[in-house]
Amino acid sequence: AHNLVERSREMYSAEIYKEDFLAVKKIVKRYRPGIEQQFNHCNRILLEYKRECEKYKVYDNIGNLMFYLMKLASELDEFLQRSTEFPERKEVSEFYFGLRNFINMYERVDEHYVIYTEHMEDERFKMKLYCVDPSLNLQECIDRGNSAIFFSATFLPIQYYKNLLSTKKDNYAVYAETAFSEEQSLLLMGSDVSSRYTRRNQSEFERIAQYIQKTGLAKKGNYMVFFPSYKMMQQVYEVFQELDGGNVEAIIQEPGMNEEKREAFLAEFSAEREKTLIAFCVMGGIFGEGIDLKKEQLIGAVIVGTGLPQISNEREILMDYYEKRMGEGFDYAYRYPGMNKVLQAAGRVIRTIDDVGVIELLDERFLQSDYRNLFPKEWEKRLVCTV
């Protein structure tokens, strides 16, 4: 349930792209020339928005655009009912359903939404109805039943999730004590290393690589190392390969791995080997949660960085929204989502009462109270170390 915040944001959001209007207009006008005018009205308004937008731009009212979008949707509906067979029907239908979704979602727009435009990296121009606070929409779903129970091992801080998953202020929250003993895990925190953008250089990568190597050589076994991005993972991996010289076996997660490659990657943790296995992975990715490697299959996780989401227009919009309303903009947009990825990655190590292992947090920011206050109770005992 810890993923429900982001998933519900997307579920209750909608977006349109200016370029799609032009592409579909070229198709439809060949079969029904009269509909071209409605496309032109929409495109003209979107063009005005595009000219106003530099990085991204927030709007309070898009009533004029919605008027023409609804007229266009009505004419497209009639066109698709009459024209059941033409080569591009699938493309036109997908555009129509996306347009209908945008119109339907607009009816939900209130103070829990931000309407914004932005220029995409692929040079397309987007307008989005962004559900920054999904609590009201989720509460409507919850109210259809007698009760709802949300469960996750990483609901921290709990108030963050209570605020975003429901509008009610009297919901119960239960912190279940862990079934695992303190002796099963060792928590280490590196105080002389960081994944900050300003610190991402060769010397920092070498220090991180040294941590990884010393951890892997301290006890033979299988380890996962989690990074905040593919780019940094690759940079440290290359440094590690030069530093290690073949003392351990290292594998690395590839972007867009299919099911076959994913299974082959996980199978490495069940294979018998004479050396330590170090698996380089991306935090928040397919190996960062939802995998179950028990006992000797995994005896340690090294987590590089605080998991902060990449800076983007949407993250900046979230930060501005929650800063104005709660004075916690950075926490809600970056710190809390990032810490959840850290907790999920750390949770790969101890899966049963028979597991033992090490969790290593490599970022000096974990020593700050803003982060220590987000630690689970089981992390009260920890050792601070340097390379």
Q: Can you name each region flagged by the protein language model?
A:
Residues 1-387:
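ASCE RecA-like P-loop NTPase motor cores
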